[in-house]
Amino acid sequence: IIEGDPEAQQGIRYNIFQLYQTYRGDDPRLNIGPKGFTGEKYGGNTYWNTELCCVPFFLLSTPKKIAENLLMYRYKQLPKAIENARKLGFDNGAALFPQVTSNGEECHSEWEITFEEIHRNNMIVYAILQHSTLTGTLDYIARYGLEVMIAISRFWSQRVSFSQPKQQYV
């Protein structure tokens, strides 16, 4: 509750309503598009916004299974993420989670924003770690999350290189 600011309180309630209208949490084949329930932009495709913003919300406000289904959505797309990385020249089980349609296919062409959005992998790891932090268990990591995090690590190990002039990885 935000006391003394009814407009902010109304805004928060509206946003919570939108989250609950957008996602029920009972089907791991479903996810939350970046525009949620009220916007058709992006065609309902999945970006990184869910992992950064929505997973923590659902972990803190609903039974943990609801947020776990958001994570399972990504876990079930791991084979497609590995295939996506392989098509781009990465190997050894590296995963690049695409901005996806419901079947896990990359939905953007290379020239658009496919390569500008590779930080989506990091948001998936963030959400997995948030799950463990907020639930106080390692169950999800042990059963599913570690496999995803290893594949993402394999991607980054091939994607970055050390810059001698900058003395850092780029």
Region locations from a protein language model:
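Acidic/polar, glycine-enriched structural segments that form the non-catalytic walls/loops
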Residues: 1-41
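Contiguous, well-ordered alpha-helical segments that form the cores/surfaces of helical PPI scaffolds
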Residues: 13-20, 40-44, 48-59, 115-131, ...
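Alpha-helical scaffolds flanking conserved acidic
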Residues: 9, 142-147
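Short, Φ-rich (hydrophobic/aromatic) sequence segments
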Residues: 1, 54-57, 71
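Helix-terminus loop motifs that line ligand-binding clefts
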Residues: 23-38, 64-126, 132, 139-143, ...
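Residue-level recognition of short, well-ordered coil/turn positions
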Residues: 136-139, 149
